[in-house]
Design a protein with these regions (language model features):
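Non-transmembrane accessory domains of multi-pass membrane transporters/channels
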Residues: 190-194, 348-388
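Membrane-spanning helices that line or support transport/gating and their immediate boundary helices
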Residues: 62-65, 109, 113, 162-174, ...
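Hydrophobic alpha-helical transmembrane segments
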Residues: 40-47, 51, 55-71, 91-101, ...
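Short, positively charged and aromatic/hydrophobic N-terminal segments
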Residues: 1-10, 14, 19
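Conserved glycine-bearing catalytic or ligand-binding loops at nucleotide- and phosphate-handling centers
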Residues: 179-182, 276, 283-284, 329-360
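Membrane-interface segments at loop-to-transmembrane junctions
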Residues: 29-38, 67-68, 85-103, 129-140, ...
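Transmembrane helix-loop junctions at the membrane interface of multipass transporters and ion channels
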Residues: 51-64, 82-88, 111-143, 249-256, ...
């Protein structure tokens, strides 16, 4: 009976801990009541809506809205990644990466449809967002736009995606290799009484979640790589198909068709490749935050300012560049003055802090009570008499 009562209390305690943990996660992640009540419906509706975009023709204003939302969503994910303390704070990132990739490909299909069907009507036929990226971003020069698009694809595919995928692969491998040692350490702390049963369960669960997360990120990086390759193929299809439709079906001149469809195709490629670059950067930031103790900006700034001598040497080197004939003196002098001012301020603050700590130690030494010989208690003499 006593064993059953203890088992019931333990089960009730575990359920209470689970409910409290779920409530804390809900309170921390969702502060808006509407999103809290309808989060599952919104997620399912979003996925279904993404699939509908692949087969449903969109008007230009709705395509503008969705393209703007894609840029906003990618920027939000990137900023969330910079404020993470540890990767498990964003454990849903692999699923978000898959959904974002699918959404971006759906927008590519929708924009391809509208470019091929209505591209002969002019640059505004595919919406104002694609027109703006085709005209304003690349100055209306489709050759420059094509070069910029290919550069972005190479950066995304060969640099960021490859690097983040390698980080995720290595992190997953080392996390799995370190799991037995971490489990033994938790068991040793539990047996020694340093931690309780609930804390041991929480640590084991966190280790398992960490291994699952890095394994999922290792696979999710392939989505980004495939998305970049698909973006290049879709761009080529838009260009070749647009030229064929414009010249053969709509009777356009070859030069006009090349300028119109190339401008629309490059604008479409840029408006989808820039969010892809943001998501890839966010993936690299998230998987590289394994041993961090603070946010990205605070951690980088504190670690750089920890070495003011290096900043001072960089200031001297920049000043030397300013004296080289042919190099612009004003930018190098300005950067040299800024770096020198930062180094001087950091060194001065460190010296002031060191002086305060020394003064504090002197004051503590003076106020510390000293032991005196007079205050030593007297020892009673003990005598033992044997016999008479």
């Amino acid at each position: 009976k006593m064993h059953k009562s203890y088992h019931e209390r333990n089960l009730t305690c575990q359920q209470g801990w689970g409910i409290m943990e779920l409530a804390d996660q809900t309170d921390q992640s969702m502060g808006i009541p509407f999103l809290t009540r309808n989060s599952e419906i919104m997620a399912a509706g979003g996925v279904v809506g993404i699939l509908i975009l692949m087969v449903m023709p969109l008007p230009p204003f709705l395509l503008d809205l969705l393209l703007s939302f894609n840029i906003t969503f990618a920027l939000t994910i990137l900023l969330v990644g910079t404020y993470l303390l540890k990767p498990l704070d964003f454990s849903s990132f692999p699923s978000i990466l898959l959904i974002a990739t699918l959404f971006r490909l759906s927008l590519n299909i929708a924009s391809t449809r509208i470019i091929l069907l209505h591209g002969s009507e002019g640059p505004a036929a595919a919406g104002n967002v694609i027109k703006a990226f085709g005209n304003f971003v690349v100055g209306g020069n489709y050759v420059v736009g094509a070069i910029v698009f290919m550069v972005l694809v190479i950066i995304n595919l060969m640099v960021i995606t490859k690097g983040s995928g390698r980080i995720g692969e290595v992190a997953a491998r080392f996390t799995l290799d370190a799991m037995p040692g971490k489990q033994m350490s938790i068991d040793a702390d539990l047996n020694a009484g340093f931690i309780g049963e609930e804390e041991a369960k929480a640590r084991r669960k966190e280790i398992s979640r960490e291994a699952d997360f890095y394994g999922a990120m290792d696979g999710a990086s392939k989505f980004v790589k495939g998305d970049a390759i698909a973006g290049v193929i879709i761009t080529l299809i838009n260009l070749v198909g647009g030229l064929a439709i414009g010249v053969l079906q709509n009777g356009m001149d070859i030069a006009d068709a090349a300028q119109t469809y190339t401008l629309l195709t490059v604008g479409d490629g840029l408006v989808t490749q820039i969010p892809a670059l943001m998501i890839s950067t966010a993936a690299g930031i998230v998987v590289s935050r394994a041993g961090s103790q603070s946010t990205l900006g605070r951690e980088v700034l504190s670690q750089i300012l920890r070495q003011p001598k290096a900043i001072g040497i960089a200031s001297a080197v920049l000043f030397g560049f300013a004296l080289v004939p042919g190099l612009p003196a004003v930018p190098f002098l300005a950067l040299s003055m800024i770096a020198g001012g930062v180094a001087y301020t950091v060194i001065k603050s460190k010296k002031a802090e060191q002086k305060k700590s020394e003064e504090r130690e002197v004051i503590e030494e003076k106020t510390r009570p000293r032991e005196r010989l007079e205050s030593t208690p007297l020892v009673d003499i003990l005598a033992l008499e044997v016999g008479y």
